[in-house]
Amino acid sequence: MENYTVQPAKSVRGEISVPGDKSISHRSIMFGSISSGVTKVTGFLRGEDALATLQAFRAMGVQIDDDGETVTIQGRGLHGLSEPTDVLDCGNSGTSMRLLTGLLAGQNFFSVLSGDKYLRARPMKRVVGPLALMGARISGRAGGEKAPLAIQGSKLIGIEYDSPVSSAQVKSAIMLAGLYAGGETVVREPHLSRDHSERMLRAFGAHVETFPGGVKVRGGAELTGRDIVVPGDISSAAFFLVAALIVPGSDLLIRGVGVNPTRTGIIDVLKGMGGDLELTNQRDESGEPVADIRVRHSKLTAMEICGEVVPRAIDEFPAICVAASLAQGTTVVRDAAELRVKETDRISAMADNLRRAGVNIVETPDGMQITGVASLKGCAADSFGDHRIAMSMMVAGLVAQGETSVSDVECIATSFPGFVNLLDGVVQR
C-alpha cells in the first residue's frame, strides 16, 4: 500500500481544470449504450470507477472506442445488450453497481455484479427492494443486502416509490428499470438529490418528467445517441476550493466546473462559512450549467449544515470537515447519516483522522460536531481505502505543523488519477 507525505504549503495559486464529472461520465456510457446510433463523449473521466462502467458495457457487446480525446459509443438500442459471459466487475464503484442493477433488471438475460471488498460491504437492499416491487428477480448475499448480486432479467411493471433516502443512485436505478417497465414509474425523495439522470435521459429522448419532490418515467421510449461534453467535476474541485480557502496567501481559478444546482451544496456551505468564492463565465454545456470558480484564502466561521443542502454536498463532506476544522467555533453537521455507508464510514474516518491532527470532534449518528483549532498538527492519516478521505487529508496536510503522511493513496485513482500532480502544480512551498 502506497503512502504519501505532505509538507506544509506557503500558498495555493494558479489556474487549473479538474477532470470530467464522474456522475456524468458513468451515465454517458450507460445511456449511450442503450441508445440507437452513435454517442460521442468529450471530457470523459478516465478514473477506475467510470472505466468499470465502460468495461461492463463492452462485456455486454457494446463497441466503445477511446482515442484519448473522445469516447465513441456505438449504441445497441434499448433491447440490444448481450448476456455477459462472466461476472461484471464494478471495482469500487457504487454508482456502477447500483445503476447497472436497475438497468439489468429489465433485460432478457442473466447477469452477476460484483466488486472489490469495500463495494461488497456496501448496502444494496435500498436498490434491490424497490426493484423487486417492479418484478425484478435479484438475489445476493445477506438476502440481497450485499454483492455479489445475481440478476435474472424479467418483465417489469411501473411503481410509485417513496424513497426513505435522498440518493441519486437509488433514484437512477429505479428510473433505468422504469425505461423497461410497463406504464409509469414515479420516484419521490425527501430532498432533491443530483439530477444528472433526469437531464441526460431527457436529452436522449426518454419520457421523463420532474415535479417538486420527485421524477416520473414512462417506459418504452427509444433513446437516440448524441454528443456529450462532460464538465469538470465539482466533487474533485472541492479539494482545491478548500485548499485555497485554508492556506494563507492563496488565489486559485478553477475553469470549466459543473455547477448543477443539485451539486453546489459545497459552494453554499463554504460561502456560508465566509469563504471568498466567485463564479464567473457561467454558461450551459450539454444541458448542464458550467462556470469558472475563483477562490481566495479566507477566515472561516463555523456554521450548522443540515437539511436540503446535505444531499447537494454529500460527496464533499470530507473536504468540508477539513474546512470546519480550521473555522472559528463549532460546526454542527446533521441529517448526513448517508455518509456512514459510502466507500467507508466517512463520519468515523474523518473524525478519526482529524482527531490525530488535534481537532476536537464529537460523532453523532447522523453527523458530527467539529470545533475548529488555530492550526492542525502533522499526523499519520489513514485513507481507509476511500479516495475522498485520502485527498481530504492531503489537503489538511498543507496547513499542518510538520509532516502529514496519508496511507493507501492509490485509491485516489478511482476518481482523480492526476490529483497529486495537479495539487503539486499549484502549491507554493
UniProtKB/Swiss-Prot annotation:
A Pfam family: EPSP_synthase
PROSITE patterns listed in its UniProt record: EPSP_SYNTHASE_1 (PS00104), EPSP_SYNTHASE_2 (PS00885)
Localization annotation: Cytoplasm
GO cellular component: cytoplasm
SUPFAM superfamilies linked to this entry: EPT/RTPC-like (SSF55205)
EC code: 2.5.1.19
UniProt cross-references to Gene3D superfamilies, sorted A to Z: Enolpyruvate transferase domain (3.65.10.10)
Top-rank lineage group of the source organism: Bacteria
Subunit organization: Monomer.
Annotated protein name in UniProt: 3-phosphoshikimate 1-carboxyvinyltransferase
Organism: Geobacter sp. (strain M21)
